[in-house]
Amino acid sequence: MNKYEIMLIIDPAIDMAMANEIVESVFDKKNINKVVKLENSTLAYPINKSSKAQYVVYTLEAKSELIAEFTRRANIAKFIWRQMVINLDTEKGFQRSKKAFKHRIAKDAKVANKGTGVKQLIENLEKTMSHKAKPSFKKEVKKSN
């Protein structure tokens, strides 16, 4: 069984319980891990002559045959305007981001350890800018008398 995330855009006039009935009729209640009703929002373009819609996200575990059956039933239901099903097990980048982030931190730490000091960096910049007007990178402390 694979992990899936299903996002539905449904009619704002319809109760969310109707969408839950379709999802629960295809998948058992025990296979549905999480249901999140997002806020009613204004759409970028009208769907079915409406500029507002409800978003509902389901996280569940199921077989691929059940996903095909859900898609068929969602296409029949008039109150489900759009649906999107994502297989979280095979989705590229879903698990990769954590590894890439750890790799990036390790790489940055190596560069920081090898790096030259700030004073040396400022001196090198001043040497290379000798033909131009030298900006002063050093902190100037005003002494008050």
Swiss-Prot record:
Top-level taxonomic group: Bacteria
UniProt cross-references to SUPFAM superfamilies, sorted A to Z: Ribosomal protein S6
GO cellular component: ribonucleoprotein complex; ribosome
Gene Ontology biological process terms from the UniProt entry: translation
Gene3D superfamilies: 3.30.70.60
Pfam families given in the database record: Ribosomal_S6
Keywords: Ribonucleoprotein, Ribosomal protein, RNA-binding, rRNA-binding
Family annotation (InterPro entries): Ribosomal_bS6, Ribosomal_bS6_sf, Ribosomal_S6_plastid/chlpt, Transl_elong_EF1B/ribsomal_bS6
Database matches in CDD domains: bS6
A molecular-function term among this protein's GO annotations: structural constituent of ribosome
Family: Belongs to the bacterial ribosomal protein bS6 family.
Entry-linked NCBIfam families: S6 (TIGR00166)
Described purpose of this protein according to its UniProt entry: Binds together with bS18 to 16S ribosomal RNA.
Protein name (database record): Small ribosomal subunit protein bS6
Organism of provenance: Mycoplasmopsis agalactiae (strain NCTC 10123 / CIP 59.7 / PG2) (Mycoplasma agalactiae)
Classification of source organism: Bacteria, Bacillati, Mycoplasmatota, Mycoplasmoidales, Metamycoplasmataceae
